[in-house]
Amino acid sequence: MDFSSIEQNLNNFKKLVAGNSDKAQITPVLVQLKLAATIHLEKPTSLSNVSDKVKKDLVLAREILELISLYSIKIKDIDSFERTFNQLKTYYYDYKSIIAPSTLEYQIIGLNLMRLLAKHKTSEFHSEIELIEFNNLDNSFIKFPLLVEKSITEGSYNKIIQSRSGVPSEYYQVFLDILADSIKEDIANCSEKSFKTLSLKDAEKVLLFNDNNQFQQYIKERNWKVQGDVIQFGNNDNQTVEIPSLQLIHQTLHYAKELERIV
């Protein structure tokens, strides 16, 4: 596959994604682009005396991987995003001395930071931060996940909440949704360990459900028993509760409410 054919496939991919085409149309083009980025486009054997042709191939391969990573988030295929980002790291860090930075670089690095936060991979988050040059930590795409991480650590979540416009790009919403769902699970687990009963009204409010049907479905998924208007958790009086229930629930509820304002 020659360079012009790869460019043509990439332009076709952009049009299909922008037009919200279905996966059946996009997948064949996507497969061809993945092959192009990994096999057909040339990589340097060393970082010295790199030819213009190889540099041109690197830039195109990077763009392909960047657009695939954003598409992966769009269709909520987080595993695909992770795999593609790991490929991109070579272009962002190893090849930075031979090709100019991409305009999408910090957005995608920031999205990976959000992925790590959403998956509770704190140590990996800090390892990735160490790879970023200090003067780029104030980049809006990097600053947002840093503020989210700081707020999680401190519990002062209001610091990151200003308005929806505070989110650097629409792709960040996907990871905020994952994080919000994770918080709901934490609240539910905390409630089960801390209380013998909880009213349906309070539970729906605490878990931030705006749709009662979804709330009822969640109750079924958790196998909670409902008697009248009360959820029975069935805790034993002698059960040791290691979680400071009210404090954690109130703190987590505040955090979840603030995240809901972003989402």
UniProtKB/Swiss-Prot annotation:
GO BP terms, alphabetized: proteasome-mediated ubiquitin-dependent protein catabolic process
Stored InterPro entries: 26S_Psome_Rpn12, CSN8_PSD8_EIF3K, PCI_dom
Domain PCI: 79-248
Disulfide bonding pattern of the chain: none
Keywords: Developmental protein, Proteasome
A GO CC annotation given for this chain: proteasome regulatory particle, lid subcomplex
Pfam families cross-referenced by the UniProt entry: CSN8_PSD8_EIF3K (PF10075)
Record family assignment: Belongs to the proteasome subunit S14 family.
Described function: Acts as a regulatory subunit of the 26S proteasome which is involved in the ATP-dependent degradation of ubiquitinated proteins.
Annotated protein name in UniProt: Probable 26S proteasome non-ATPase regulatory subunit 8
Organism: Dictyostelium discoideum (Social amoeba)
Taxonomic path: Eukaryota, Amoebozoa, Evosea, Eumycetozoa, Dictyostelia
